[in-house]
């Protein structure tokens, strides 16, 4: 979105590290994304932030685990904005505001915002592993229990939790 590159590290973050999260005391923060990483970040940030708004392009049910949706909806200080995307951010040296666009109506709204955490667009960079470990159709490495139904697993024992198709390689 417009303005994000200029404010990266100054209110716009691509992760919720402990050091940044500890600075969110009593802040109203925005988490962008609708998959598990965004939901887990929202839960984590809700411990200290005044409020957390999850901005979701579609709905949580489209890409988040059911258990996590239940946890989010049980937390009083987490709000959902489905069918919404970030149009732009603004600030002079630090994030000050966010402009959100509702995808179903095209309506735009501006909000004061000092911190925005982005968890979208996971894109694997695993081409170099072609022929070495099993990857799914999207390029993500298949590991642990997910290997059981894939011909790449050759041992009699089941794969360990994060083990790839190369036994012993996690």
Feature names for model-found ranges:
Residues 17-20, 35-37, 58-60:
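Short acidic/polar capping segments at secondary-structure boundaries
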Residues 115, 168-170:
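Conserved catalytic-site loops of classical short-chain dehydrogenases/reductases
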Residues 7-9, 30-31, 57-59:
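Short, flexible loop segments at the rims of nucleotide/cofactor-binding pockets, characterized by
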Residues 46-156:
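A Rossmann-like FAD-binding core segment of flavoenzymes
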Residues 1-27, 106, 117, 137, ...:
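FAD-binding core/adjacent interface of flavoenzyme oxidoreductases
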Residues 25-49:
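Rossmann-like NAD(P)H-binding beta-loop-alpha module
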Residues 1, 24, 40-42, 64, ...:
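Short glycine-/acidic-enriched loop or helix-start segments at secondary-structure transitions
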């Amino acid at each position: 979105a417009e303005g994000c590159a200029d404010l990266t590290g100054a209110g716009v973050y691509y992760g919720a590290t402990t050091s940044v999260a500890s600075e969110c005391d009593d802040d109203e923060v925005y988490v962008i994304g609708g998959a598990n990483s965004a939901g887990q970040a929202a839960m984590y940030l809700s411990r200290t932030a005044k409020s957390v708004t999850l901005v979701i392009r579609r709905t949580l049910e489209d890409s988040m685990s059911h258990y996590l949706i239940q946890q989010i909806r049980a937390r009083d200080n987490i709000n959902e904005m489905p069918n919404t995307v970030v149009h732009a951010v603004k600030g002079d040296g630090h994030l000050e505001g966010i402009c959100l666009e509702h995808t179903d109506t095209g309506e735009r709204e501006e909000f004061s915002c000092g911190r925005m955490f982005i968890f979208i667009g996971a894109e694997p960079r695993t081409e170099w592993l072609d022929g070495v470990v099993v990857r799914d159709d999207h390029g993500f490495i298949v590991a642990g229990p997910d290997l059981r139904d894939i011909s790449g697993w050759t041992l009699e024992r089941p794969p360990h939790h994060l083990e790839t198709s190369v036994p012993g390689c996690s």
